[in-house]
Amino acid sequence: MTTPVRTLVLLRHAKSEYPDGVADHERPLAPRGIREAALAGDWIRANVGKVDAVLCSTATRTRETLARTGIESDIRYEDSLYDSRPGIVVDLVNGVDEDVTTLLVVGHEPTTSSLAFALADPSSDADALMRMTQKYPTSAIAVLTTQLPWAQLELGGATLVDFHVPR
């Protein structure tokens, strides 16, 4: 029996506002972020397909980003995705059910780009890597594939196949 190709989609939250007196964790999306989160959802549906499960930070801006994408799936909100590190995210991914073939992670910088780079193996798309190196802006999407079961995914264990910035 062959292991199915699994797809990991890493979405940085959309552009947020900086209202006075609002804690960082509670910052909402800016109007531009609302628009771009919807564009991100459209792009994911058109280019990746159905998302089976989502891991999302508990921060207001990530929750609002996910809601505005219009992606309906099994969602798990994780406090540890806020102010996180790549290893923490990999640990969360390692715990995802093996029936999930496409997983979306909605998170923050610098973790999202660091994770994408750390997971990318030598066969990754050079153009996508170059664009990611230049900047991983709000609403940016990295798409990686792997033949490893989620429980075995480790750094260098996936191929970066696309990088998109919805505008």
Question: Where does each model-flagged region fall?
Answer:
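Glycine-rich phosphate-binding loop signature in dinucleotide/nucleotide-binding domains
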Residues: 47-50, 95-100
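A glycine-rich beta-strand to alpha-helix segment
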Residues: 100-122, 129
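Short, solvent-exposed aromatic-acidic interface loops
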Residues: 158-167
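Short, structured active-site "lid" loops
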Residues: 73-74, 97-103
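Active-site-proximal alpha-helix that buttresses catalytic centers in soluble enzyme cores
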Residues: 2-88, 120-126, 136, 146
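Residue-level preference for the first positions of well-ordered beta-strands
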Residues: 8, 102-104, 141
